[in-house]
């Protein structure tokens, strides 16, 4: 049984952010990493798997960042996921969140239902990183659904060659009421 400790999760997220912010294009983790005890991250992930012609063009990276921010804000803050998909969605939508199904129709239904149930939902993107066809956001979620302190989230989006969203992963957690270091979580 694989155990994901907070340290391992934070270390992995830090490695992803470091790779993306340095423009390396590759986040590497092998099963022999971490002492070869089988508790490391398995496999090799290369961002170029989905984009054989990865170009680190500042213009394209800016476009991708802008598209993801607009996609998220249009869907959740403007409560218009249909428009978000029309403007920023690609030909397919692969979803890795276990609460949502694949496909843009499922995304529209999920967001419409969620924002109808919690109309005060607001997403504030605090940081955004882009590398090739991936964009990572670090966000604060507020509103009734998230309690008094809110929720933090890291979302990873993959975009197609036209800068349209085609895949999504996320990690979400409640903001802690106490902190050993006094630093904000988002």
What are these regions (language model features)?
Residues 3-13:
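Bacterial N-terminal signal peptides that target proteins for export
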Residues 24-74, 78-87:
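Short, low-complexity N-terminal intrinsically disordered segments enriched in polar/charged residues
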Residues 63-67, 106, 149:
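Soluble or luminal CAZymes and related metallo-dependent hydrolases
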Residues 34-56, 73, 109-186:
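A beta-strand edge to alpha-helix "cap/lid" segment located at domain peripheries
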Residues 19, 29-30, 137:
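Intrinsically disordered, low-complexity segments
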Residues 81-131:
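A solvent-exposed, acidic/Ser-Thr-rich amphipathic alpha-helical stretch
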Residues 13-23:
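Bacterial N-terminal signal peptides
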